[in-house]
Amino acid sequence: MWIKELELKHYRNYDHLLASFSSGLNVFIGNNAQGKTNFLEAIYFLSLTRSHRTRADKELIHFDHSTVSLTGKIQRISGTVDLEINLSDKGRVTKINALKQAKLSDYIGTMMVVLFAPEDLQLVKGAPSLRRKFIDIDLGQIKPVYLSELSHYNHVLKQRNSYLKSAQQIDAAFLAVLDEQLASYGARVMEHRIDFINALEKEANTHHQAISNGLESLSLSYQSSVVFDKKTNIYQQFLHQLEKNHQKDFFRKNTSVGPHRDDLAFYINGMNANFASQGQHRSLILSLKMAEVSLMKALTGDNPILLLDDVMSELDNTRQTKLLETVIKENVQTFITTTSLDHLSQLPEGIRIFHVTKGTVQIDSDIH
């Protein structure tokens, strides 16, 4: 899939913008604080209905307006789709082909994106919540049912934690009802995650071996807070541990086990990647991003859109070449932001170059 056209109204420093793109590489050049990242954020927002930079929607609204409108014309294998998001102080409205979508799970996945931003380099050593978010964003696009089950899980988790914080003593019968619901939704969430990580590992290892010239292997491990011996009995084991932890959870005032506490570990040649070099970290993250692209294509039949936000300068010539070779080979529409073309070691023919200045975007020349 690829974005044919994007229109922004009152989005951050863009008062109004209408732009069309190449189905291949699109490069956005400009000094810092001109709007390059805002532009990629808008594409991300149109796809996932959320920003990767802020939780406060009001920050997305142009300073002298009260509403935001984003519309995009998306070319999918199945045909052209029009996406629209309208944002105001009353909330957000999402539409597909002018039809309002009642649930996020009905909207997300229509346009898939993979974002590679500087903060992704913290994925290995950062907080577990970053790695859970990484899994959730990809799975939500690939399997809309996952978003629904995760939403149900979080709703029951909130109920259980609220009860634990307010209860003066344990009501075992009431907790049993919540435990059953939490284990049911949580087991399905974990099953989806485990399947996803197993599939992602195969793709990521292939890319990592290519980047390292066969010298390194990459493996991934889903680290569950629920102890289980096989995937088929996660529900029973989860339920048992919830019941076993009633007293502990009551005193701590929160739920001590479940997918909300799970993690993801990375290993290079069998060694924990927390102890890898900076160069190995970059190769690992690059391998993951390329694996996300190839796995989405394998599981859905359509390519995602790749957003590279000021990361090319973080990669040496070898890693840049591997990345560009992959997106060209797989026909992935790619958006690259940079302060200078000097940061790009090799640019193939057939790219579209844009200049970004103070919330305006001008095409350099149609196709280079």
From Swiss-Prot:
Q: What GO biological process terms are annotated to this protein in UniProt?
A: DNA replication; DNA synthesis involved in DNA repair; double-strand break repair; SOS response
Positions with a binding annotation for ATP:
30-37
Cited InterPro entries: DNA-binding_RecF (IPR001238), DNA-binding_RecF_CS (IPR018078), P-loop_NTPase (IPR027417), RecF/RecN/SMC_N (IPR003395), RecF_2 (IPR042174)
Q: Name one GO molecular function term.
A: single-stranded DNA binding
Can the keyword ATP-binding be found in this entry's annotation?
yes
Keyword annotations for this protein?
ATP-binding, Cytoplasm, DNA damage, DNA repair, DNA replication, DNA-binding, Nucleotide-binding, SOS response
Record's protein name: DNA replication and repair protein RecF
Natural source organism = Streptococcus pyogenes serotype M49 (strain NZ131)
